[in-house]
């Protein structure tokens, strides 16, 4: 998941730190040292991660937009200037803006806030922001919780005793609470020095940036892989005392199934599966990046000559048009499949299903799936022209019939236009007109969209006034009748199961004969 590093460059970060030796350090130097350590780790183990660098004081500035070039990020650390007072709220607003602009509101993001624990002074300080949080309008709301899935990690260039001497720690903890409890505060253990800063950032790396290594198994074939991004623990909301479920480091393939049968299932998350080549001594080859391009190329050449099960699996799934079902834990499955980035490039991906014995209802229970050879006859037919899926449920599904869907404005517009087209062809299209009218009426009542009924009634009355002199007399009667019935349906006394029927007129018989 993307990372935004938010660096405090206010005057308080220039406070000197007494460190052994002749060189004088400031708190911002300690912060830059810790971030350099983080960037070096990510360049080696998280090189697919996108990272952005934001600096702030009373205002915020995007120093480096989202990038995978960690050399650029490290250069920006050495080019930061000092500014005025601290305003954490402006920094959080900046994070909201750049993440939503780049990734939208659905992609999880990690925010690493590096500060010295000073909250600012007066208006714009964190104390003032938290005190006035509940007195704001919606357009000026406090930026937490972030409008996207996130974790907020606060790296304090101060020890716990210094923060507890004021209310700084309490205010920073409020930030984590406002972010739905997603995140953590890190402080320096002991005196402020480079070693203790490294230790603090090491804890962050262990918590959030440790690569997930696993062993992919299929029978006697195995491969060491890295799953990126790291799968997050999943909590089942229905449980009384929920315990986070974590996937196993042994990923065992339990079977294969056609892509058409798996269709497009709901998943919790998607991950890249990257092979890790090992040499005879068990050291990683070709994993991560090195400073020396020649060493990197030679390592990649060595890794490319070693047979790897991941390559075999990826190619087979791509050619055969199948997916592999993989067991992640007790009653928890996922699928491995090939996904194309472009016409020439594709990747081995893994998607995680929701935990449970039956994550995909149309496949039935995972434990009851078996090989084709166990069936008395081929369930796919001799010519591969049929499929045993989807399994037909015993009970009638509520979604078995055609339903009205207005997810997009175009769907609603199409249904209204269909009614108007039939209205202009009355009385020949009387039955079709009332069929579409009743379908729209029921959908509008189900959604509570009463204004739609009033609007369509007004449109029908307008169509009635626009009828040409050559129009059949029955058309005007039917349009007026339909408009009146829609207006009645828009009241609180409307009955959902009631159907609007055509008005019987002296002209109805002749129109029916023409139909």
From Swiss-Prot:
**Record-linked InterPro entries:** INTS14, IntS14_b-barrel, IntS14_C, VWF_A, vWFA_dom_sf
The intrachain disulfides are: none
All copies of domain VWFA, residue ranges: 2-204
Work out whether the entry's keyword set contains Cell membrane.
Answer: no
The places in or outside the cell where this protein is found are: Nucleus
Q: Which residues does the annotation say bind Mg(2+)?
A: 10, 12, 86
List every position bearing N6-acetyllysine: 418
> What are the BP-aspect GO terms?
RNA polymerase II transcription initiation surveillance; snRNA processing
For the keyword Mitochondrion, the answer is no
Pfam family of the protein (one): VWA_2
The main location class comes to nucleus
Please tell me one Gene Ontology term that the record gives under cellular component.
INTAC complex
- What are the protein's UniProt keywords? Acetylation, Magnesium, Metal-binding, Nucleus
Role according to the record: Component of the integrator complex, a multiprotein complex that terminates RNA polymerase II (Pol II) transcription in the promoter-proximal region of genes.
Q: Which family does it belong to?
A: Belongs to the Integrator subunit 14 family.
On subunit structure and binding partners, the annotation says:
Component of the Integrator complex, composed of core subunits INTS1, INTS2, INTS3, INTS4, INTS5, INTS6, INTS7, INTS8, INTS9/RC74, INTS10, INTS11/CPSF3L, INTS12, INTS13, INTS14 and INTS15. The core complex associates with protein phosphatase 2A subunits PPP2CA and PPP2R1A, to form the Integrator-PP2A (INTAC) complex. INTS14 is part of the tail subcomplex, composed of INTS10, INTS13, INTS14 and INTS15.
Stated name of the protein:
Integrator complex subunit 14
Gene name tied to this protein: Ints14
